[in-house]
Amino acid sequence: MTTPPSRLIQSLLLLVTFVVAGCATKDPYHTLGWKLENCAEPSASECGLSYFQEHPDYDLAFAEFTERGNAFNNQWIEDILDRIRARQREGGVVVVTFVHGWKHNAAETDPNLIDFKKALTVIGKGSETLRNRRLVGVYIGWRGASLDLPGVENLTFWDRKSVAEEVGAGGVTKLLLDLDQIDQKQRQNVLVVVGHSFGGAIVVSAVSEILTERAIGRDG
């Protein structure tokens, strides 16, 4: 005769099931390559899945990183940089790089991404300000939301803070260096880097790495 599980075991099983079911994906959200005018219809699935989106008033690139700070796919990052280089040669670029914060990710439904698109739309329609330069948004995605459960996600503060620091010290550093090199091609180019919440920690970590490398380079 089998003994029924105790209430403690039942509670633990229920808790584990609850948490596992609420875990956010560890996979990238944008996996399709660029196609000409792939976001002429923004609601199309092809647009939402693309890691380089060509909207009427701006381009939007997605650079997504693992919790270890590595790019999910280095070729995707190179494709993004190649597209930005091409835009730069056409007449200059204004690149706005945004790193989302804690409890957020690179999903098309994420509030940080939605607000970023709204901001790009407003800037992109100000053609007099851009002066024929192409506006390019770069959305740096990381697993800022490890749990999708309201309330429980607040428990991830210290864990996500640690991940943010590691992401900043990883591939984001190289990405910002590459964007800086593009920016220096013409005086009219502009590069802006913004981080929200723990996204700010990622920016600080990445910039610290860059400044350290440059200081060592001068001394050497």
Feature locations, PLM:
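P-loop NTPase catalytic core of nucleic-acid-dependent motor ATPases
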Residues: G171-T173
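Alpha/beta-hydrolase fold nucleophile elbow
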Residues: K185-G195
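Gly/Ala-rich beta-loop-alpha elbow adjacent to hydrolase catalytic centers
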Residues: V194-G195, G199, V203
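Histidine/cysteine- and/or acidic
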Residues: V192, G217-G220
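Acidic, His- and aromatic-enriched active-site or binding-groove loops in soluble protein domains
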Residues: K161-A169, I216
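Flexible, membrane-associating and regulatory peripheral segments of lipid-active enzymes
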Residues: T2-L14, V19-R160, L176-Q186
